[in-house]
Each structure stands twice: as C-alpha cells, then as structure tokens.
Amino acid sequence: MFQDKKQLQYLWIFKPELNDIAKRIAEDHTKWMNETHTKEGDKALLMLNWSIGPEFKDGNKTGNMSLILTEVYENQAGIDNHFDLAKNNGATFRDDFN
C-alpha cells in the first residue's frame, strides 16, 4: 500500500477482438515508461501495473474486455513530469481502440 503518494489510474473497455492491440499498447507504454521515468527522488515512479481481463456488469461478463493502468508516483512532481515527457516527445501511448 502506498500512503501519501500520487496515483494515476485509467480504465479502457474494448471488444475482445482488440485484445492484441491492448497488449501492444501496454507493452509500448511500459517500454516508454522504463526508458524515460526515474525510480528515485521527487519524480520517482514507484509502481506501474497493467491488468487485463473480462468486463463484468452486475456480476456477469459483458463480452467486452477491460484494460486497467495504474501508476504510482512519489508526489505530484512525478505526475507533472510524466505529462511533460509525453507532451514533449510524442509519447508512444495512443488510443488504438477507435
């Protein structure tokens, strides 16, 4: 558990036929994060986690898939740095689910 840290969390819902694209997005974003983000200091990325699985509604599978991204940073400076890096280099994170 991370106390007094800053977190970003995103959720995408998509059709199962886009599963390979979702996996590629996760791999590309993870590679970019590992190449550009520090693991120490005020801007530290403390955790990066992806989860992919079926979407549920009222306890039943909908037929769709869900992709969840969680990023935990030491503080707000890490989040600000994250978005600055993405904006300044045309980050490899994109929305291919359309």
Regions found by a protein language model. Name each.
Residues 1-6, 60-63:
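Short, flexible turn/loop "capping" segments at secondary-structure junctions
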Residues 5-15, 68-70:
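Active-site-flanking beta-strand signature of metal-NTP-handling nucleotidyl enzymes
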Residues 87-98:
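Outer-membrane beta-barrel domain signature
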Residues 28-36, 85-86:
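Structured segments of extracytoplasmic/periplasmic soluble domains
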Residues 33-68, 97-98:
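Short, glycine- and small/hydrophobic-rich beta-strand elements in well-ordered beta-sheets
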Residues 20-24, 75-85:
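Short amphipathic alpha-helices within nucleic acid-binding modules
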Residues 15-20, 35-39:
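Short acidic-aromatic low-complexity motifs
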